[in-house]
A protein has these predicted regions:
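One-carbon transfer enzymes
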Residues: 1-164
Length: 164
């Protein structure tokens, strides 16, 4: 068996996407990857508690240089942005070209780019009268939500749906 891909997950908030990744890894649904570190942009990110509970090493890195140092220390082969609310600097994108993926809560190209994150996306979808929404996983490039799309999953927007 080949060595597993070492994944660092960057977070800023509650960590629901992180928890989904932790659960999938624990269930054997991500057999080729292992989360080696969770790096948060804020000390109060609940995602840090989720990671600690799962036995995953954590760090808080507020500045780009700190993020790069933590990534290098982790030995990560790949980076997943799971609710990470900062734009990565060019140096990190260049160092990890085509090895950084983002989970975005809309069907790109709709409701993406600067200012579209979290509940703001869901609110805009509802206000736009959309009949479907979903999530997009894409590679990260120098733009905001402009990288190559890896996959999308559609879900219907139901009457009575809320941004929550």
């Amino acid at each position: 068996m080949s060595e597993k891909i070492k994944v660092a997950v960057l977070v800023s908030g509650g960590g629901t996407n992180l928890q989904a990744l932790i659960d999938k890894e624990a269930d054997g649904q991500i057999p080729d990857a292992h989360i080696v570190k969770v790096i948060a942009s804020r000390e109060d990110a609940f995602a840090l508690e989720r990671a600690a509970k799962a036995g995953i090493e954590t760090a808080v890195a507020k500045e780009p240089q700190q993020v790069m140092e933590e990534l290098q220390k982790s030995g990560a082969d790949m980076i997943v942005l799971a609710g990470y609310m900062k734009v990565l600097p060019k140096e990190i994108i260049e160092r990890y070209r085509n090895k950084i993926i983002n989970i975005h809560p809309s069907l790109i190209p709709k409701y993406c780019g600067k200012g579209f994150y979290g509940k703001r996306v869901h609110k805009a979808v509802l206000e736009g009268g959309e009949k479907e929404s979903g999530a997009t996983v894409h590679f990260v490039d120098e733009g905001v939500d402009t990288g190559e799309i890896i996959l999308q999953e559609k879900v219907p927007v139901l009457e009575g749906d809320t941004p929550d």
